[in-house]
Amino acid sequence: MIRKIRYLLFSIFLAIFFMNSSFSQTANKFDFERIEDNSFLIEEAYNQDPGVIQHISSFQYMKDHSWLYTFTDEWPVPGRKHQLSTTIPVLNNGTSGFGDIALNYRYQAIYMTRFAFSPRFSLLFPTGSWQKGLGSGVMGYQLSIPFSYLLSTKIATHYNLGVTFTPDAKKADGSKFDQTIYNYGLSMILLLNKNFNFMFEVVGNRTFIKTAGTKTIITNSLFINPGIRYAINFKSGLQIVPGIAVPIGVGSSNGSSGIYAYLSFEHPLWKP
């Protein structure tokens, strides 16, 4: 099942890439105001506009009483081509505290009216307590490949592939292991109008854990995440986007569910 989804995503990426050359013929039709870069579990491929910064809060509460809050700050450096951001997590998995903080760099390789591509590289700093199971205890590395494609004037789509590698991570008992996580996802967003969207996301991952002298442990997760978002725009340039969704486990994650809340503040800080 997961392998088929990966092949499907890869095929979609190739199709979108080779359609690139024809986009200019219909560019004007798709050049309209809409909500961008405000997805929930999926990463959209749009960097910040020059001079505009974004502050994002998200909170996810699951049926097993675990929860995760993240705060992300995104800054153009100094324009759209390069972007730096930080993500600070606070979580509860039986005990509460800060997780491992991420420093992210994203490059806007392609930005067209209908298509965008912006690969991201992240460093995961060991700020969470590995003794409490809140962090890895070592530096981690993450690569993400997000694509965004405007399918029509009413439907936007986004596609993600990524990998996270944490060598010599520490368990609470002090033992070490290597962890590799492959993630994938896609979303379809119905643009009802410029300020209100219906969203449907699918996200999954496959995790490999290798400890000394043991076989590799493999686990999978797969969630669908239907939701809505709404943009509130001010004359000053401030945009506030609240959103809510319901993550539902399917396949190997069947029986797991929760609630997801999102809030973004985006505003100009300087004139480019």
Model-derived segments and spans:
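Transmembrane beta-barrel domains of Gram-negative outer membranes and organellar outer membranes
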Residues: 25-272
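Cleavable N-terminal export/targeting peptides
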Residues: 1-35, 269-272
